[in-house]
UniProtKB/Swiss-Prot annotation:
Gene Ontology, cellular component aspect: cytosol
Organism annotation: Escherichia coli (strain K12)
Superkingdom in the source lineage: Bacteria
One annotated GO molecular function: DNA binding
Name this protein carries in UniProt: Uncharacterized protein YgeH
Amino acid sequence: MDLENKFSYHFLEGLTLTEDGILTQGNEQVYIPQKELGVLIVLLESAGHVVLKDMIIESVWKNIIVSDESLTRCIYSLRCIFEKIGYDRCIETIYRKGYRFSGQVFKTKINEDNTSDYSIAIFPFTTSLNTLDPLILNQELVQIISNKKIDGLYTYPMAATNFCNDHISQNSFLSRFKPDYFVTGRINQNNAVNTLYIELIDAKNLFLIASNHLPVDELHNTSQFIIDNILQTVHKPERSVRLAKQDQGYKNHYLSDEMLAGKKELYDFTPESIYRAMTIFDRLQNKSDIQTLKTECYCLLAECHMSLALHGKSELELAAQKALELLDYVSDITTVDGKILAIMGLITGLSGQAKVSHILFEQAKIHSTDIASLYYYRALVHFHNEKIEEARICIDKSLQLEPRRRKAVVIKECVDMYVPNPLKNNIKLYYKETESESHRVIIDNILKLKQLTRICMR
């Protein structure tokens, strides 16, 4: 059979068949031989209808004369393959006529690098809530996006993605079908409200385009958020790291792994881990030619300097100056994302520029980036300004989103030690005694920031 066009078939039970003859279910793959594949494709093209034996033979064997036994052997082989993966009785024999594929199947194209269209895959959301089926939300979101009929945007059906629930199966899908974008998400309960946290990712180099969190019953807003960010990337390609060279895909993936390792060290929030994070970020910005990654490294290095100052490992004024010098590297960039704005809000806030900090934080919120970090930065600035209740609210929100980030846990413990003074005197606030030397150092250094001469950004 002539297989000129790239395509794939998707079955409701999570099976996927590609034109190379690979049948996939989750992490399992089975190869279908060429003749059997030809027979199967003829049946799939007429799924639900009877296909005459002579028509199958003519389509697969073309001008070669073969007996019915050759077709019978192919049908038997196909049935054995499907039965092995638990998908039996899908090929029916219609007495004295032919065969029929009785399962429901969807046919999709495989996105080619040279096409002007763009495609998106929505992977299954994860949740620990027993009262919610995330696949229902996935299906609704797929339907909403596809029903909007955005010119040039192809949405993969749930039949293609509903078994892509881990990194192995997702990476397999990405490498075989090559969508332009994909969406991942998780559902958590936040103050008794079921909230969907999503990330829109450029599939070519695994770079985060945008993230957001919305109540699960606001899927129309979620779909519009996804579409808007895709359209901005398509119509303003300078926003997208897809401009990175195609042959650097593996290198970019490796650099992204290094970035994640550096962030993990920073999140651990010990002096030793922060020094390790600085080494990683400095090495990354020196060897990467991706401007967005270099910019993020500068901003994270700025946060590292301020974090070391809070631990008493460097002078606060010197740390603030170094942080601001690093931000000078990104000040000329015309398009900045929420991560950059949020870190700039932190540095300016801890440098005494409250109004500038507030504006930057508000802009970061609009650009919808790492919300947990945004709340963490705002908590530090509120703590610095002795707005303890506001700091407590922000750090609690940060921990609700990312409970495993130790830096937020430490600041939460510090904030909880800082309480109103019950005595009627000029000292409105004081902090309780603590056995933790590191906590005392952090609190003391946050208070010392108030004594610094205001440092202005150049």
